[in-house]
C-alpha cells in the first residue's frame, strides 16, 4: 500500500510541476510574441507584412497540423509506455516518422507545383516584390517541413511527461524569433527575404534540438523498418477527424488573409 501511495504522490508532484512549467511557458511566450509582432510590423512595413501573412500562412498551418499529429503519436506512445511494450514504442516512433516524411514529400510536391502559380496569379503582389515573394514561399515551405518532422520527437517528450524540455525549447524558439525580428532593417538585405530565410534556419535548429534530446533520452527514438500496416491505419484513423477540423480552421483563417 505504501508503494502505491508513493507512486500516487510522485505522479501528483509530476503533474503539478508540469502544470507550473507549462503555465510559465505560456506567460513568457505571450509577452514575447506580442513584442515580436510589433517589431516585425515595424521592420517589414505594411506591404511586406501583408505579403508575409499571405504566403507564410503555411507556417501557421504547420503548427496546427503538427499539433494534431503529435497528439495522435503521444496517445500511442503513452498507451505502450503504460503496458511497458518497449519494442512497440520503437515501432510507433518509426511509423510516425514515416508518416511525417510521406506528408513532407506530398507537401513539397504540392507547393512546388501549385505555389509559384498561386503567388504570381491569385495573390495581389506588386511586381517589384514578386521575386522576394517567391523566395519567401520556398523558405516558408521548408519551415513547414522542419516543423512537421519534429512531431515524433515531441510526441516522445510529451508521452514521457518531460514538459521541462518542451518548455525550454519552445521558449528558446520564441526568443530566437524575437532576435530575428529585431534584426529586421539591420542586415542590409531585403527584409522579407531575410526574415523568411532566418525563420527557416531557426525551424531547422529547433528540429535538431528536439531530435537530439529525444534520441539521447529515449531508447525507442531509433528508426526501424516497420511493415505492419495496421499501425499505420490506426495512427491515421485516430488523427483523421481532428486533422480535418484543424485544417478547416486554418483554411478559414488563412483564406481570409489571402482574400484580403
Q: What does each model-found stretch correspond to?
A:
Residues 1-15, 192-198, 210-253:
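Interhelical loop/hinge segments that connect adjacent transmembrane helices in multipass membrane
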Residues 26, 30, 57-60, 95, ...:
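Residue-level recognition of pore/gate-forming positions within transmembrane alpha-helices
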Residues 125-150, 167, 171, 179, ...:
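Alpha-helical transmembrane segments of multi-pass membrane proteins
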Residues 41-43, 47-48, 161-164, 175-208, ...:
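Membrane-interface helix-loop junctions in multi-pass transport and translocation proteins
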Residues 16-28, 137, 142, 156-182, ...:
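Alpha-helical transmembrane segments of multi-pass membrane transporters/permeases
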Residues 4-13, 45-46, 62-100, 119-124, ...:
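Transmembrane-helix boundary and interhelical linker motifs in polytopic inner-membrane proteins
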Amino acid at each position: 500500500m505504501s508503494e502505491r501511495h508513493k507512486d500516487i504522490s510522485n505522479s501528483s508532484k509530476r503533474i503539478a510541476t508540469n502544470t507550473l512549467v507549462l503555465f510559465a511557458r505560456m506567460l513568457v511566450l505571450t509577452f514575447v510574441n506580442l513584442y515580436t509582432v510589433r517589431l516585425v510590423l515595424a521592420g517589414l512595413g505594411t506591404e511586406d507584412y501583408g505579403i508575409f501573412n499571405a504566403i507564410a500562412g503555411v507556417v501557421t498551418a504547420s503548427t496546427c497540423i503538427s499539433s494534431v499529429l503529435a497528439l495522435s503519436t503521444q496517445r500511442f506512445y503513452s498507451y505502450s509506455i503504460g503496458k511497458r511494450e518497449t519494442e512497440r514504442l520503437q515501432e510507433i516512433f518509426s511509423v510516425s516518422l514515416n508518416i511525417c516524411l510521406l506528408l513532407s514529400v506530398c507537401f513539397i510536391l504540392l507547393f512546388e507545383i501549385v505555389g509559384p502559380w498561386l503567388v504570381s496569379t491569385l495573390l495581389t503582389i506588386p511586381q517589384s516584390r514578386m521575386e522576394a515573394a517567391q523566395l519567401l514561399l520556398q523558405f516558408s515551405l521548408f519551415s513547414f517541413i522542419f516543423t512537421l518532422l519534429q512531431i515524433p520527437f515531441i510526441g516522445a517528450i510529451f508521452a514521457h511527461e518531460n514538459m521541462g524540455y518542451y518548455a525550454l525549447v519552445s521558449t528558446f524558439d520564441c526568443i530566437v524569433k524575437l532576435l530575428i525580428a529585431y534584426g529586421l532593417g539591420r542586415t542590409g538585405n531585403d527584409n522579407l527575404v531575410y526574415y523568411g530565410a532566418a525563420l527557416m534556419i531557426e525551424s531547422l535548429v529547433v528540429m535538431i534540438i528536439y531530435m537530439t534530446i529525444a534520441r539521447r533520452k529515449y531508447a525507442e527514438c531509433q528508426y526501424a523498418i516497420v511493415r505492419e500496416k495496421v499501425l499505420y491505419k490506426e495512427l491515421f484513423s485516430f488523427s483523421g477527424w481532428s486533422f480535418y477540423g484543424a485544417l478547416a480552421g486554418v483554411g478559414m483563417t488563412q483564406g481570409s488573409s489571402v482574400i484580403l
